[in-house]
Amino acid sequence: MKIVIDLMGADHGVLPIIEGVSRALENKSFSVVLVGDKDKATPFISKELASKVEMIHTQDYIKMEEAATEAIKRKESSIYLGMDILKNGADALISAGHSGATMGLATLRLGRIKGVERPAICTLMPSVGKRPSVLLDAGANTDCKPEYLIDFALMGYEYAKSVLHYDSPKVGLLSNGEEDIKGNTLVKETHKMLKAYDFFYGNVEGSDIFKGVVDVVVCDGFMGNVVLKTTEGVASAIGSIFKDEIKSSFKSKMGALMLKNAFGILKQKTDYAEYGGAPLLGVNKSVIISHGKSNARAVECAIYQAISAVESQVCLRITQAFESLKSQSFESQSDQQDA
């Protein structure tokens, strides 16, 4: 298995990415192609690691303040070169750089899976249960039609089943209430269409994401990104509040010591790094979009995520799902019309 790693554009430079690759190679067997500035990367690459990776040198990359459309013009940029390597035989690509550039190039260079109108960013959200919830779209498509959300539901369902190995995953539609009549025009129209699928649970509220009421939560990219960023902010704020309160007295410090294991589990469940990155579903190869501020652990977990996606053949599974499940929807709608 060959995984392409974009070294450029992350908030903390190349070091966390290289450290993450090194840690992953200690636990998994895979080939690595690093794409980026060799002069910046070499000081952090040990002789042992150098023997395990291939390095493609380029100094160009799409900066965060640049438009995503720049990516298609800059054929020597790290993400363009990386996407070409993926297109021509590699199995997966991971980038913590410009997410818009990654999404745009993946769609244009790799192509969409037949039947998919819009690829979507799929992210894992912590829940009170033993397994996380899947949320999509987390930011790829801010303006959506009902048909797009149907695609997101199909892809999220297949990802939960094939990659995460959830039995009979249930899909919920994010709304401002559980009742069928709740929601804006987009939600109401999507709800009518999703009723044709056996996996559809119904509407869910924001709080249900973290209760694990359903396995997959579907929404437009604007709402999904707001949910994601709000969750990150709340988790960070709670962590800061805990730290301040623990330091406030000797009694608090002793209590924290007794609850050390519980705090460790809480941190693991709410730490974005443990979830790796966000798969871009709907394109013909596995692409993982990592957080710009990714540390070594986040990169390591993103690699494991990519390996799982490739081993489970998620792109093929989604292709097959669109052939069979969309047929199920068509037959169901035809039966309703005949009735």
From Swiss-Prot:
Protein name in the entry: Phosphate acyltransferase
GO BP terms: fatty acid biosynthetic process; phospholipid biosynthetic process
InterPro entries: FA_synthesis, Phospholipid_synth_PlsX-like
Family: Belongs to the PlsX family.
Superkingdom: Bacteria
Subunit structure: Homodimer. Probably interacts with PlsY.
Chief localisation class: cytoplasm
Chain's role: Catalyzes the reversible formation of acyl-phosphate (acyl-PO(4)) from acyl-[acyl-carrier-protein] (acyl-ACP). This enzyme utilizes acyl-ACP as fatty acyl donor, but not acyl-CoA.
This protein's pathway: Lipid metabolism; phospholipid metabolism
Name of the gene this protein is made from: plsX
The enzyme's E.C. designation: 2.3.1.274
Keywords: Cytoplasm, Lipid biosynthesis, Lipid metabolism, Phospholipid biosynthesis, Phospholipid metabolism, Transferase
Localization: Cytoplasm
Reactions this protein catalyses: a fatty acyl-[ACP] + phosphate = an acyl phosphate + holo-[ACP]
Lineage of producing organism: Bacteria, Pseudomonadati, Campylobacterota, Epsilonproteobacteria, Campylobacterales
Enzyme class: transferase
Any one annotated GO CC term: cytoplasm
Pfam families: FA_synthesis
Molecular functions (GO terms): phosphate:acyl-[acyl carrier protein] acyltransferase activity
